[in-house]
Amino acid sequence: LDTTEVTTSFKNFDLAQSYKNFKKLYFEVEMNYSTKSNINFFSSEMYVATLQPNRTYCIYRQVSAESKEYEGACFFEILENDTTKVSIKKKAVGYDGCRRINIFGIK
């Protein structure tokens, strides 16, 4: 059951722009899910995301195994002036389903 996804915002994105200039972020996310009986279980997923500088990205979690609803779990961004680091920001309000993020590196 794949209940996580990485979404990106490509508003005003120039499709002719070269993808080779984008950084790839290698990271693992451990999420906290609830079943119908509210028993928590954990899932760890590995991702590779293509990032653009100065954009905020969001990892979403599924509210429950039976639900189609999603909540924002954690936000991260890569800054144009330092492409070797990623800023991780927990969601300020609401349920935070993100237990842990392991950053393996940016290339």
Model region roles, listed by residue range:
Residues 23-33, 84-91:
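A short beta-strand element within beta-rich, extracytoplasmic domains
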Residues 44-53:
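Short edge-strand/loop segments of extracellular domains
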Residues 22-25, 101-103:
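Generic beta-strand hydrophobic packing signal
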Residues 6-10, 38-43, 56-107:
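Extracellular jelly-roll beta-sandwich "head" domains, especially the C-terminal globular C1q domain
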Residues 1-23, 32-44:
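Surface-exposed ligand/attachment interfaces on beta-rich extracellular proteins
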